[in-house]
Design a protein with these regions (language model features):
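P-loop (Walker A) phosphate-binding loop of NTP-binding proteins
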Residues: 5-7
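ATP-dependent small-molecule kinase phosphotransfer cores
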Residues: 33-91, 97-98
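Post-Walker A helix-loop "phosphate-sensing" segment adjacent to the P-loop in P-loop NTPases
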Residues: 21-30
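Walker A/P-loop
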Residues: 13
Length: 128
């Protein structure tokens, strides 16, 4: 499993999608979130959009490999989704540093971690 991690706006989602296009055997782990979808996002493709109550229920049931609350919204990766995908595929994650740290605690997961940064702070500010 490959993890691409970076601060917001650096381009990890764009890079993840390009890798998947070029190497279709890489499946993208689709995270769950409580934030509202953006106009161009598709439920089940970009994120699995759920309510805060649903997310908190999944937390209490210990269903996540990793989760975090960022700017009043939850983001997380369900264990079942990862376990199902990893059986027959290479898997790529597009998550933040908090998620990477939590996933690293699971010794049964073989991880390749890549952290992306940018030296162009002006462009990063424009993206955010």
């Amino acid at each position: 499993m490959v993890i691409l991690s970076s601060p917001s706006g650096v381009g990890k989602t764009t890079i993840t999608k390009k890798i998947h296009q070029k190497y279709p055997t890489f499946k993208i782990s689709v995270s769950h979130t409580t934030r509202l979808p953006r106009s161009n996002e598709v439920n089940g493709v970009d994120y699995n959009f759920i309510t805060s109550n649903e997310f908190e229920k999944l937390i209490n049931e210990k269903k996540f490999y990793e989760y975090a609350k960022i700017f009043d919204n939850y983001y997380g990766t369900l264990k079942k989704n990862v376990d199902d995908l990893i059986l027959n595929n290479d898997l790529i994650f597009d998550i933040d540093w908090q998620g990477t740290k939590q996933l690293s605690k699971f010794k049964n997961l073989k991880l390749i971690k890549i952290y992306l940064i940018t030296s162009n702070k002006k462009e990063l500010k424009e993206r955010l």
